[in-house]
């Protein structure tokens, strides 16, 4: 009798696991192995997204349009937790990106936005530097190079408000956040 109850409980767990909707997760890969890992995961039947951007690479004798990963050493997989081991076992996968020790799921909306960004012809530059309100920053590129002030607000990727101490004024700059650095 106990055996049947345990078997039914296990069947319920299996049914619950089978009906879990897959979610997107970021996977960290070995350096420069993104395309290889992408291909291997596709072969395993795993829904995979590798954001690539087109850029010109210049050699001494020629210029060539190439596709390179937008986020170095990262790809995205859409899986259910049961498939985590399948992803882990894929050669070139280092680990899942985690939050509090668990693989961190990424909302579908963020993946959709990333796809839109890749499909647009916008020039994309990625920075890992995080700016917060109150940071002292310096403009390191563009026509305002050398400008130093306090970051008041960021309004997306291309709009920042910087307060210049001596003028007691706020300047709204329409520049990429990548043109700033913390000081």
What positions do the PLM features span?
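Short beta-strand-centered aromatic/proline hotspots
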Residues: 147-153
